[in-house]
Structures are given as C-alpha cells and as structure tokens.
C-alpha cells in the first residue's frame, strides 16, 4: 500500500475527504519525523515504536573488489512492532 492508497483508506474509515485525510497523514508523518530528529521515540500503543538508533563506525567490504572500506557512524530509524500488531500479523 502506498501513501495515496493509505490516505484514501483513512478518508473512507474516518468519514473524511481525501484531502483532509491526506493532511492528517502528512501531519502524522511530520510529527514522527520531528520527534525522531529530536532523538525522541514515538510510541503508538498496540502498534509499535519508532526510534532513532545510532550505528557506530565500522569496516565494510567492497563487494566488487573485496577491499575493506571505512563506513562512517550514522543514525538510522528503527521500528519495534507492538504486541497487537505482531499478533494481528501472525
């Protein structure tokens, strides 16, 4: 499912116009992004938690040449699914 399809599904279930649902979805994504930029986690009880994780510097390997390559430290986004979501999928 892509973003426009998700917005359409929200519009139908919440009795909103597609434009309103799209604004709601964009606001939600903006808030999650902002919280992660501030190094906060976002927990949606039953659904899961979005959090920022730090990946330390490490040595990788160039797959074409086999030579070692230094990979800089970086931050990444992680998602830990909640119990209700895990149960719904299984």
Swiss-Prot record:
Keywords: DNA condensation, DNA-binding. InterPro entries: Hist_DNA-bd (IPR000119), Histone-like_DNA-bd_CS (IPR020816), IHF-like_DNA-bd_dom_sf (IPR010992). GO terms for molecular function: DNA binding; structural constituent of chromatin. Signal peptide: none annotated. PROSITE patterns: HISTONE_LIKE. GO terms for biological process: chromosome condensation. GO terms for cellular component: cytosol. Belongs to the bacterial histone-like protein family. Histone-like DNA-binding protein which is capable of wrapping DNA to stabilize it, and thus to prevent its denaturation under extreme environmental conditions. This is DNA-binding protein HU-alpha. It comes from Pseudomonas aeruginosa (strain ATCC 15692 / DSM 22644 / CIP 104116 / JCM 14847 / LMG 12228 / 1C / PRS 101 / PAO1).
């Amino acid at each position: 499912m892509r973003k426009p399809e998700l917005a359409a599904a929200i519009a139908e279930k919440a009795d909103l116009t597609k434009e309103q649902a799209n604004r709601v979805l964009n606001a939600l994504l903006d808030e999650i992004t902002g919280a992660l930029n501030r190094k906060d986690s976002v927990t949606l009880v039953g659904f899961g938690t979005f959090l920022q994780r730090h990946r330390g510097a490490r040595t990788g390997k160039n797959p074409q040449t086999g030579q070692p390559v230094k990979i800089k430290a970086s931050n990444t986004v992680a998602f830990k699914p909640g119990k209700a979501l895990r149960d719904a999928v299984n």
